[in-house]
From Swiss-Prot:
Oligomer and partners: Homodimer.
Similarity remark: Belongs to the protease inhibitor I16 (SSI) family.
Site (Reactive bond) residue list: 67-68
Entry's localization field: Secreted
Keywords of this entry: Disulfide bond, Protease inhibitor, Secreted, Serine protease inhibitor
Gene Ontology cellular-component annotations: extracellular region
Keyword DNA-binding: no
UniProt GO molecular function: serine-type endopeptidase inhibitor activity
One Pfam family cited in the UniProt record for this chain: SSI
Disulfide cysteine pairs (residue numbers): 29-44, 65-95
Record protein name field: Subtilisin inhibitor-like protein 3
Function as written in the Swiss-Prot or TrEMBL entry: Inhibitor of subtilisin BPN' and trypsin.
Length: 107
């Protein structure tokens, strides 16, 4: 099997370069889901469905979020099925982050 091991972070701010990480978790998806991520099984299943592309994660359109701007930045770094992966995205606030990434960034 090709390795799939990631480190995910979340912090307040508009970019990873200026935001201090508030939380970080590890996520290993091969051969089985493990790591410090609180929902490793669900997060791995969602990443598999998105072919390892965090930008393709399905958003939950049923969630209603306020329009407050309190930016939250997430990062993913590591290896997905043997390929290097580096991803960064800024969400308008924590609610939008949680709705926009299902289990992957909910930690």
């Amino acid at each position: 099997y090709a390795p799939s091991a990631l480190v995910l972070t979340v912090g307040h701010g508009e970019s990873a370069a200026t935001a201090a990480p508030l939380r970080a978790v590890t996520l290993t998806c091969a051969p089985t889901a493990s790591g410090t991520h609180p929902a490793a099984d669900a997060a791995c299943a969602e990443l598999r469905a998105a072919h390892g592309d965090p930008s393709a994660l399905a958003a939950d359109d049923a969630v209603m979020c306020t329009r407050e701007y309190a930016p939250v930045v997430v990062t993913v770094d590591g290896v997905w099925q043997g390929r290097r992966l580096s991803y960064e995205r800024t969400f308008a606030n924590e609610c939008v982050k949680n709705a926009g990434s299902a289990s992957v960034f909910t930690f």
